[in-house]
Swiss-Prot record:
Belongs to the TRAFAC class translation factor GTPase superfamily. Classic translation factor GTPase family. LepA subfamily. It is found in: Cell inner membrane. SUPFAM superfamilies: EF-G C-terminal domain-like, P-loop containing nucleoside triphosphate hydrolases. The gene is lepA. It is a peripheral membrane protein. GO terms for molecular function: GTP binding; GTPase activity; guanosine tetraphosphate binding; ribosome binding; translation elongation factor activity. GTP binds at D19, H20, G21, K22, S23, T24, N136, K137, I138, D139. It catalyses: GTP + H2O = GDP + phosphate + H(+). Keywords: Cell inner membrane, Cell membrane, GTP-binding, Hydrolase, Membrane, Nucleotide-binding, Protein biosynthesis. This is Elongation factor 4. It comes from Xanthomonas campestris pv. campestris (strain B100). GO terms for cellular component: plasma membrane. Required for accurate and efficient protein synthesis under certain stress conditions. May act as a fidelity factor of the translation reaction, by catalyzing a one-codon backward translocation of tRNAs on improperly translocated ribosomes. Back-translocation proceeds from a post-translocation (POST) complex to a pre-translocation (PRE) complex, thus giving elongation factor G a second chance to translocate the tRNAs correctly. Binds to ribosomes in a GTP-dependent manner. Its EC number is 3.6.5.n1.
Length: 601
């Protein structure tokens, strides 16, 4: 396709931290370009999932193509690709950005720059995108436009002199944003090959059409009837339909170079069209794939078990359906003595895990128990093999283990200067090692290397509480480091409960064992016999607490009486309790499994 026909196309996305008004700005742009009539407008048009609306976050990438007549009289075609804003979905963000030539950096004029938008902005600059700063929420009394501009320049390092000040809520200055998109973001450039190359930005499952993929055509064109090949898997598919979203789905006769739209090619599940992969023509393939594709690796694992064992087949079916839409979700069957049959699931992070569990419970009416989330450790065995371990109860016997390695992440925290001390204390508590502190304008950037296991559970919540909600966090995986790790097992009346095993640093083992026993003592109801709760490392018991038995007062009917008579009755009761203990089973309530999560609180 010639550069003339691409001259009036503008592909852009919006980079913003959660809650800075990205979806509202998108709504206004759609309204101004006439994508939807006023009566069809609803808040957050592009957040199609009810959980996205409720939590006010964007999870999946969406796109919309809008015609816009600029003030110079020309009609431009704006392709807006929506990106998720949360750190769990950073790979999806990088793929959305790779499909664009420019990005709007939306910053809340009242709050200033936050870490997540910094990370995504760096990704955009690395990929050579033109970044246009937009200051949102200027209608708020606390908005400080000059401070926000200074922060963008100091923290991100891009010129904010021409930043567009808008209020997405009231619609103020939205036309200036559209003019900035048209005049400051460059049109798509022709590539070095004329063979078809299309980047898959996202894929989702449609009950009637099968898998629908959102693609950006880099070169060549896609028409219904052409045979395409997915470059990472080598599979070929026949294209049924192509089109764009306006935000409604609209069919076209072809998608040309520079355009963003959807294709439907009878692919059965989303693993057949992985995000970030390249599509090309099967008969005349491109010489190489587009750069940047990687398999999504789950970083956090947890067991999901149905409360009612009869729901197991329904849980499997629900997970299968969710996986059609969520390429990052992994699961395999797992059985646990304490919990019965369920699944071991892998997620990108804690938010991803919460969303999956919420969707299973809400959309499929399942009642679920989840075990404490763990990260993936690497275990070097004595025979030299390295195995990934996502479940503490699957740790090989200690005489076969040479060393255990934990994942380390690099965390960048942005905070106002007042909270630096609190945040450093928190990071040190979490076994972090400091990399550097930079003072950037009115913000401070603190960099730490932290064990991922410490970050996964509650680091985000604690960071928000020590900084009164002002600090923001972005992190990425670095490497695996060896350390003195042990598995703490929980025994109840001498039986090991596999779902309560945790892997901890040796220096924390005693404290965690003690806390776990105390917590379990509160949560396990009293039985007719004593319940011994023990925490053990290997064969060594490190802590114990006992839930005392409920007992009947057998001496009530002896008034004065002889002491030997009383002793006889007490001995008889003791015998009965002993027998009961041998045959009795302790039911462990759901709260006890979640106790592992709350121990640090």
């Amino acid at each position: 396709m010639s550069s003339d026909s691409m001259r009036n196309i503008r592909n852009f996305s919006i980079i913003a931290h959660v809650d800075h008004g990205k979806s509202t700005l998108a709504d206004r742009i759609i309204q101004l370009c006439g994508g939807l009539q006023a009566r069809e407008m609803e808040a957050q048009v592009l957040d199609s999932n009810p959980i996205e609306r409720e939590r006010g976050i964007t999870i999946k990438a969406q796109s919309v193509s809008l015609p816009y007549t600029a003030k110079d009289g020309q009609t431009y075609f704006l392709n807006f690709i929506d990106t998720p804003g949360h750190v769990d979905f950073s790979y999806e963000v990088s793929r959305s950005l790779a499909a664009c030539e420019g990005a709007l950096l939306v910053v809340d004029a009242a709050q200033g720059v936050e870490a997540q938008s910094v990370a995504n902005c760096y990704t955009a600059v690395e990929q050579g995108l033109e970044v246009v700063p937009v200051l949102n929420k200027i209608d708020l009394p606390t908005a400080d436009i000059e401070r926000a501009k200074a922060e963008i320049e100091a923290v991100i390092g891009i010129d904010a002199e021409d930043a567009v000040a808008v209020s997405a809520k009231t619609g103020l200055n939205i036309d200036l944003v559209l003019e900035a998109i048209v005049h400051r973001i460059p049109p798509p450039k022709p590539r070095d090959t004329d063979k078809l190359q299309a980047l898959i930005i996202d894929s989702w499952f449609d009950n009637y059409l099968g898998v629908v993929s959102l693609v950006r055509v880099m070169q060549g064109e896609i028409k219904p009837g052409s045979k395409i090949q997915v470059m990472s898997t080598g599979r070929t598919h026949l294209v049924d339909k192509v089109g764009v979203f306006t935000p409604k789905r609209k069919e076209l006769v072809a998608l040309g170079a520079g355009e963003v739209g959807w294709i439907n090619a009878s692919i059965k599940d989303v693993h057949g069209a992985p995000v970030g992969d390249t599509l090309t023509l099967a008969a005349d393939p491109a010489p190489h794939a587009l750069p940047g594709f990687q398999e999504m690796q789950p970083r956090v694992f947890a067991g999901l078990f149905p409360v009612d064992a009869e729901d197991y087949p329904d849980l499997r079916e629900a997970l299968d359906k969710l996986r059609l839409n969520d390429a990052a979700l992994r699961f395999e069957p797992e059985s646990s003595e304490a919990m019965g049959f369920g699944f071991r699931c892998g997620f990108l992070g804690m938010l991803h895990m919460e969303i999956v569990q919420e969707r299973l419970e809400r959309e499929y009416n399942l009642n679920l128990i989840s075990t404490a989330p763990t990260v993936v450790y690497e275990v070097l065995k004595t025979d030299g093999t390295i195995i990934p371990m996502d479940n503490p109860s699957k740790l090989p016997p200690l005489n076969h283990v040479e060393e255990i390695r934990e994942p380390i992440i690099r965390a960048n925290i942005l905070t106002p200067p007042d909270y630096v001390g609190n945040i450093i204390t928190l990071c040190e508590e979490k076994r972090g090692s400091q990399i550097g502190i930079n003072y950037l304008g009115s913000q401070v950037q603190i960099s730490y290397e932290l064990p991922m296991a410490e970050v996964v559970l509650d680091f985000f919540d604690k960071l928000k509480s020590v900084s009164r909600g002002y600090a923001s966090l972005d992190y990425h995986f670095l490497r695996f480091d060896a350390g003195p790790f042990v598995r703490v097992d929980t025994l109840i009346n001498g039986d090991k409960v596999d779902a309560l095993s945790i892997i901890v640093h040796r220096s924390y083992a005693d404290r965690r064992g003690r806390e776990l026993c105390e917590k379990m003592k509160e949560l396990i109801p009293r039985q007719m016999f004593d319940v011994a709760i023990q925490a053990a490392v290997g064969s060594q018991i490190i802590s114990r607490s006992t839930v005392k038995a409920m007992r009947k007062n057998v001496l009530a009917k002896c008034y004065g009486g002889d002491v030997s008579r009383k002793k006889k009755l007490l001995e008889k009761q003791k015998e009965g309790k002993k027998r009961m203990k041998q045959v009795g089973r302790v039911e462990i309530p759901q709260e006890a499994f979640l106790a592992v999560l709350q121990m640090d609180k």
